[in-house]
A protein has these predicted regions:
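Short acidic/glycine-enriched loop/turn segments that link adjacent beta-strands
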Residues: 56-58, 66-69, 91
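Enriched for short, Lys/Arg-rich terminal
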Residues: 31, 70, 74-99
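Basic, Lys/Arg-enriched alpha-helical interface segments
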Residues: 1-59, 77-78, 85
């Protein structure tokens, strides 16, 4: 059975911020980046444990291929849910304010 993808409000706000930031310079590029991020997140429905564990126990980090972003998420196997916690640029401190 597929896991349900759920987003923390912070993760949704970060996706919107990424889109807005890139759109200011390249609207087509912004759509490509967000599509790539969402495609990788969608894979977690089937493969929730595919990304490596982060330094923080219980949190995984999934790099976005071709783009400098990382998705941080947690898996709840009992509820069969994947919680998207943060979407960060790779230049940012990866563990700052993770919850």
């Amino acid at each position: 059975m597929a896991y349900k993808i759920r987003y923390r409000p912070t993760a949704l706000a970060q996706l919107a911020s990424i889109f807005d930031h890139i759109t200011a310079r390249n609207p087509t590029g912004a759509r490509r980046v967000i599509t790539a991020i969402k495609h990788r997140i969608d894979l977690l429905e089937t493969f929730p444990h595919s990304a490596k564990e982060s330094e923080i126990p219980g949190i995984r980090e999934m790099p976005i291929v071709r783009y400098p972003y990382v998705v941080f998420y947690a898996v709840d196997d009992d509820a069969q849910e994947v919680w998207i916690l943060r979407v960060r640029h790779t230049s940012q401190d990866p563990t700052h304010h993770l919850d």
